Regions:
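Fe(II)/2-oxoglutarate
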Residues: 1-7, 180-191, 207-334
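Active-site region of the double-stranded beta-helix
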Residues: 1-19, 32-196, 204, 209-244, ...
Length: 334
């Protein structure tokens, strides 16, 4: 594993991969851990007025469902009512009542978080997602559960007590909340403070309780492959290079297509090894390559005014100047 980003967080990568990676939970205190999403950024997101469900959710671990209308409001746009916009006053009220604020897929709508996620994904060759949690002291947003991902927790504010338990005992384990009758040995008990980083291996059961103030942390989930990912990749590998018509016409043509597909699959199976399948599945699981940052509207406007792209259609500024010249000329003739 090579990852400059992780090296900044956990120190020596070889030591981390040999001792902790997918083996053991651990807490690190990097010299300078600055989560890209914190309480100031959260306030800015609310100030912008566009934060809404499904990116916004409030949760409790005590099986009490927090209804959407308890923390959102509606807006009327062009005569149509739209629901699900974040309401800060309602959110704070729910926080005071013990609920946790959960922001999903922060990397999709906050550029600095998206840049961190893209960098980490490229370094690790894994799909990465970002979630933000805000929990009051004594509050617990999620019951003890297992994630289908390795998780890095970046503590941004307040304090939170974490309990991490054993990995699944069975190979065919289930993600999500643990059944009431399942017991799992505790492996780590630690209070995180701002600047701390917690690593939770994939599948290790865990829960967290607010310890002091409003606890804020950013969770980065590092996804890995499932059996379905491998099956999908295998199907794609077996079908690769097939030039059969998409819609065979008639029963004879359909039967011929069956025979051809089976023959091609047998030939391809002889050339595909486990490593080939693994690489194909990993490649398919990654998000599309991040494009170069798109041209901004300000850049477009500057190019428009200076003879760049779009000069065939004058912008509003040039239209205004033309109108003023015509008006001045008309006045001069009278």
């Amino acid at each position: 594993m090579e990852s400059p980003t992780l090296a900044d967080w956990v120190g020596d990568i070889e030591t981390f991969t040999g001792r902790q990676w997918q083996r053991e939970p651990a807490v690190f205190t990097p010299e300078a851990l600055a989560p890209p999403f914190d309480l100031d950024v959260l306030d800015a997101a609310f100030d912008g007025g566009l934060l809404r469900t499904p990116y916004l959710e409030m949760v409790r671990s005590d099986k009490v469902t927090v209804p959407t209308e308890a923390y959102t409001t509606s807006r009327v746009v062009n005569g149509v009512t739209h629901e699900g916009f974040a309401d800060r006053a309602k959110v704070i009220e729910r926080l005071r009542a013990g609920a946790t604020l959960l922001l999903r897929c922060v990397d999709q709508w906050h550029r600095p978080t998206g840049e961190l996620v893209a960098r980490l994904s490229e370094e690790l060759g894994r799909r990465v997602e970002a979630f933000f949690f805000l929990t009051p002291a004594g509050g617990q947003g999620l019951a003890v559960h297992r994630d289908d991902a390795d998780v890095f927790v970046l503590q941004a504010a307040g304090r939170k007590t974490w309990y991490v338990h054993d990995a699944p005992a069975a190979a065919d384990w289930s993600l999500g909340e643990l059944p009431d009758d399942e017991r799992s040995r505790q492996r780590l008990h630690r209070v995180l403070e701002p600047g701390d980083l917690l690593y939770v291996p994939r599948g290790f059961a865990h829960r967290a309780v607010g310890a002091a103030g409003l606890s804020a942390h950013l969770s980065l989930t590092i996804r890995d492959l499932s059996l379905q990912d491998l099956r999908t990749a295998l199907a794609q590998q077996l079908a690769e290079g097939s030039a059969l018509p998409a819609r065979p016409l008639g029963q004879a043509a359909i039967a011929d297509a069956c025979g051809t597909l089976l023959g091609q699959a047998r030939e391809r199976l002889d050339t595909i090894g486990p490593e080939d399948l693994l690489l194909a599945a990993r490649a398919a699981s990654l998000p599309p390559a991040t494009p170069t940052r798109p041209e901004s509207f300000a850049e477009t406007a500057r190019a428009w005014e200076t003879g760049g792209p779009g000069t065939g259609r004058p912008g509003l500024g040039s239209v205004g100047r033309t109108w003023r010249r015509l008006r001045a000329a008309a006045r001069a003739t009278h």
